[in-house]
Regions:
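Juxtamembrane intracellular "pre-TM" segments in multi-pass secondary transporters
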Residues: 177-205
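C-terminal transmembrane helical hairpin of 12-TM major facilitator-type secondary transporters
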Residues: 266-312
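Cytoplasmic helix-loop-helix junction between adjacent transmembrane helices
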Residues: 94-133
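Extracytoplasmic gate region of multi-pass secondary transporters
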Residues: 19-20, 200-242, 249
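Cytoplasmic membrane-interface "Motif A"-like loop-to-helix N-cap segments
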Residues: 61-71, 261-274
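Helix-to-loop junctions at the C-terminal end of transmembrane segments
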Residues: 51-63, 252-264, 351
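Helix-loop-helix hairpin linking two adjacent transmembrane segments in secondary transporters
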Residues: 129-175
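Conserved MFS/SLC helix-loop-helix module at the cytosolic interface between two early adjacent transmembrane helices
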Residues: 50-86
């Protein structure tokens, strides 16, 4: 089930994030300026925001298999449709609709992993599942630009279409919904809205929003920082970004394993928040004094700032329970995506008006604000013994 969850989410991310690799072709062949091409590339993400919570509700009602199969099939259909039309307006509409469908994988694959693995293994397996995003971005980067350059935008869009179609078939054939009692036989406390009478889930959402700010800044501006501030070539900067993404994926897995061993999801989140604040603060200082160490610090920040993602995701699924976790995970993803949409223009303006060091220093404040909000006392593993 872990392999299927990883594969379906990876294929969805090839569609969601892979459109960004069409920007050079849209700019050169379709005459779009970079702002217009960037808007086209963002349409799948905008579509996701609209439906994440709705897909979570469907997962809670009908299970993971149906949602993964139908969602992947609809994503494939939208990608095939986008590849079949010439009008950029029509392409944009289908990309938006595809994003709405691709959102299905986020909540469903997360619940699939949590449902089939015991508590002492969930951190590790969720960390592995969380690597779907960087792996999907990497796969898209390897294939889509070359297809677009050699055969055009339509041919390039066929790649995520075929990938998502394959994911739909695999989900329909291979997914087995994790066991849970029928709603009629469930305990009353399992059916109660976990957001009522408790601030725990809201606090985790807030912490995740605050921690996604440095993550988004690092991922968005590392390339341009290396090229304009550190004087690197585009090829060298791109290679460094790829290297940092790979390390970030490994960091998510390591953080998950760490949480399993210590028997806590939220204590590690708090420690990671401290690490993120320190890393961003050091980055601001080393960049201000033009130290060559700033590049190593940026790599460390690239790893630390993404390491909490799987832990928060797992904690939310465990706290919300089998009848509410789909909606809770949808809410988590929606809040993070909205934040990720706001951060680049805001910090881009700050960098333009001031400097990179000031932007990095401001970033360091967000993890510090998150520290007192981490609901450590409500940790879902507080009654589980650490593993050995």
């Amino acid at each position: 089930m872990l392999v299927i969850a990883l594969a379906t989410t990876l294929c969805a991310n090839v569609f969601i994030n892979g459109v960004a690799f069409l920007i050079p072709t849209l700019h050169a062949e379709r005459g779009l300026d970079l702002a217009e091409a960037g808007l086209v590339s963002a349409l799948p993400s905008f579509g996701m925001v609209v439906t994440l919570i709705a897909w979570g509700y469907l997962v809670d009602r009908f299970g993971e298999r149906i949602v993964l199969a139908v969602g992947s099939a609809l994503t494939a259909a939208a990608a095939f449709a986008a590849a079949s039309v010439d009008s950029l307006v029509a392409v944009g509409i289908f990309l938006f609709l595809g994003g709405m469908a691709a959102a299905s994988s986020n909540s469903a694959s997360g619940r699939l992993v949590v449902g089939w693995f015991p508590p002492h293994q969930r951190g590790l397996v969720m960390g592995i599942r969380q690597t779907a995003q960087p792996l999907g971005v990497g796969l898209g980067a390897l294939v889509i630009p070359q297809l677009a350059q050699s055969s055009g935008v339509s041919a390039a869009l066929l790649f995520p279409a075929i990938a998502c179609a394959a994911a739909a078939v695999v989900s329909a054939v291979g997914v087995v919904d994790p066991p849970r009692p029928p709603r009629a036989e469930a305990r009353p406390e399992d059916l109660v809205n976990p957001y009522r009478g408790s601030s725990t889930l809201w606090r985790i959402h807030a912490v995740s929003v605050l921690l996604v700010v440095p993550q988004c800044v690092v991922w968005t501006f590392t390339l341009v920082w290396l090229m304009t501030d550190r004087g690197w070539s585009a090829a060298s900067a791109g290679a460094m970004v790829t290297f940092a993404q790979i390390l970030g994926a490994a960091g998510r897995i390591a953080a998950g394993r760490w949480s399993d061993k210590v028997g806590s999801r939220l204590h590690p989140v708090r420690t990671i928040a401290i690490g993120a604040a320190v890393a961003m603060g050091l980055l601001a200082v080393t960049d201000l004094i033009h130290s060559p160490l700033s590049i190593a610090v940026m790599v460390v920040a690239s790893v630390v700032t993404v390491s909490d993602n799987g832990l928060a995701f797992t904690a939310i699924a465990e706290l919300a329970g089998p009848f509410w976790s789909g909606r809770a995970l949808g809410t988590q993803n929606t809040s993070q995506l909205l934040t990720a949409g706001i951060v680049p223009p805001v910090f881009g303006a700050l960098i333009t008006m001031a400097s990179f060091p000031l932007a990095f220093a401001v970033c360091a404040l967000f993890p510090l604000i998150a520290l007192p909000l981490v609901p450590v006392a409500a940790d879902p593993l507080r009654n589980q013994p650490p593993t050995t």
